[in-house]
């Protein structure tokens, strides 16, 4: 069996100019980055402002196993499938982070015959966006410490600096550090830490900005610390929002690539869904909607994380209205939630028990009044009996379900799913967010935890309660909520599989992302700098004398 990278390397890519032609782009609408990549100019949105938007389809998933359930693969396969049946469809995806690429998950460009290419480039650096985001973020960090060293005119309280440094890598050693050691010439000694770039507020801002000037304004509004009188200090107080924005002048432009079947894909931004808001950029999604009849996008991890944030944060802030939600499920993941000892062996009992997880995610998505279609991402270990079992279960609940073979067959494996998505997207979608912004921070958090996570009670630490009051007193109480929690469970406890309910969910800390425009609630001891596993994927990656990469996935 060929690996994903072997399949990708055998693909005949079309030059990016030809892909751009399929979108009716002119030479002035994009800038080429080599033969197979391009940046799309922001001016395109103004050029197409009078063009009607296409339909918006969100792809999400049930609670995954550590290896993931193929959400990106189905997103890409569905896009290829729609194009195969004559529809103009474009995928709008996130860019992979180097952290999981070298960590436990490997590359994040889909799999099998449903991938985006050039796969190696996209997984490794791509067009430099994440480096630009890291640089802009760390410029702010450097200026904060320099300001303190140079006299601290703003009277920054060094114990109340809330802006960390970032690195696009899993590195647990950087979670808690001391900086400024070695004498006064090296600055002021203080405790600090790093977070992974994809959890950075600058990443979130890039993905939630509508223009370059909007980006600059949002960066300026980031609260990086509090002064000795506990007043908030913003990046614009350091007068460096313009400098940070200049580092992002190209990164803000969405990237154009292609699938293995040479259909257009727009890739931009990459916030994680467990420790950030988990969606690609507003700009990329809006461009795709103008350039296609069907935009297929995804949100990270399961529906309780990425999809909830897509629907309650991104759609609300961008004025987007999804027409259909595709919920990806795998038989192996359902058996995992049902307590199977070996998910690669037929186990109807475990599969049936695992339906509780599937049903909970379906129920959650239906709360937003958007049509839902279930896609079963087929694995070779799935048996006919298991497929029949899950099909009957969904049909008994009146849910459209489709067996997807996009890994093995590419777009051909998503023909049935494509037709079901077209049908669902043609139905009336009365999308509405889960909660009203005017509710208190506590009420909004409790609504998500009880409605989406099925918690019986939400317990707030004293630190969290104090910060909630502070945020409301500062006038930010009407912002949407971004809960950071484990992706391994619907709850805040990774050990609670399937569909736990009635438990107590713990909110440890509350943070304000004043630039991005949301409030972060940290649940269940989640951390924003992952670590590497005992044997990271990096150990399997190599390159030969001709520059050919192997082992990426």
Swiss-Prot record:
Q: Which Pfam families match?
A: FTHFS
Q: Which residues bind ATP?
A: 65-72
Q: Which CDD domains match?
A: FTHFS
UniProt name for this protein: Formate--tetrahydrofolate ligase
GO BP, one annotated term:
tetrahydrofolate interconversion
Q: Name one GO molecular function term.
A: formate-tetrahydrofolate ligase activity
Alphabetical list of NCBIfam families matching this protein:
PRK13505.1
Describe the reaction catalysed, as an equation: (6S)-5,6,7,8-tetrahydrofolate + formate + ATP = (6R)-10-formyltetrahydrofolate + ADP + phosphate
* Pathway the protein acts in: One-carbon metabolism; tetrahydrofolate interconversion
Question: Sorted alphabetically, which InterPro entries does this protein's record hold?
Answer: Formate_THF_ligase (IPR000559), Formate_THF_ligase_CS (IPR020628), P-loop_NTPase (IPR027417)
- Similarity-based family: Belongs to the formate--tetrahydrofolate ligase family.
